[in-house]
């Protein structure tokens, strides 16, 4: 066991444009190689596209999209007497958010649109409308948990 003290998690500062910690986290997840200004341009550009397409507040659309992506259950491996079982467990709130943001950006990168702004906007709008790859991933995760419900008593 490590003997060092507990290191507190650093608080994420809200982004300058929308004053939202959620947007700030999205920017950090999009960021590659420490290039934050580029990820900010991508994020804000995607929000502009969302505003043009829906005519609604892009922050509200984004928040609803994230709520739609968040998984409730997931399976985690657990070894019991030489066999590894996939045990369904409830996802902690902070992990729900990080998984949702990660899935959103991962599947946005895999889309066919020309620029990352368009891809991200498309994926957010799809998630808002309960369709798209990130929603499919959540459903897949829930299906796995449901299929392994018999092992739920192995929870720890």
From Swiss-Prot:
Keywords, sorted A to Z: Ribonucleoprotein, Ribosomal protein, RNA-binding, rRNA-binding, tRNA-binding
GO biological process: ribosomal small subunit assembly; translation
Name of a matching Pfam family: Ribosomal_S7
InterPro entries (alphabetical): Ribosomal_uS7 (IPR000235), Ribosomal_uS7_bac/org-type (IPR005717), Ribosomal_uS7_CS (IPR020606), Ribosomal_uS7_dom (IPR023798), Ribosomal_uS7_dom_sf (IPR036823)
GO CC, alphabetical: cytosolic small ribosomal subunit; ribosome
One Gene Ontology molecular-function label: rRNA binding
Biological role stated in the UniProt entry: One of the primary rRNA binding proteins, it binds directly to 16S rRNA where it nucleates assembly of the head domain of the 30S subunit. Is located at the subunit interface close to the decoding center, probably blocks exit of the E-site tRNA.
Assembly: Part of the 30S ribosomal subunit. Contacts proteins S9 and S11.
Family the UniProt entry places it in: Belongs to the universal ribosomal protein uS7 family.
Protein name (database record): Small ribosomal subunit protein uS7
Native species: Thermodesulfovibrio yellowstonii (strain ATCC 51303 / DSM 11347 / YP87)
Gene designation: rpsG
């Amino acid at each position: 066991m490590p003997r060092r003290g507990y290191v507190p998690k650093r608080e994420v500062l809200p982004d300058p444009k929308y004053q939202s910690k959620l947007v700030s986290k999205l920017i950090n997840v999009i960021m590659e190689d420490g290039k934050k200004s580029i990820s900010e341009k991508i994020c804000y550009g995607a929000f502009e596209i969302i505003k043009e397409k829906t005519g609604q507040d892009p922050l509200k659309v984004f928040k609803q999209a994230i709520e739609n992506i968040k998984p409730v259950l997931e399976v985690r491996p657990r070894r019991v007497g030489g066999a590894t079982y996939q045990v369904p467990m409830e996802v902690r709130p902070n992990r729900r958010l990080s998984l949702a943001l990660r899935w959103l950006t991962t599947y946005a990168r895999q889309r066919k649109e020309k620029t990352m702004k368009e891809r991200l906007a498309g994926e957010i709008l799809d998630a808002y409308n309960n369709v798209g790859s990130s929603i499919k991933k959540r459903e897949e995760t829930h299906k796995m948990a449901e299929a392994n419900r018999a092992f739920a008593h192995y929870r720890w």
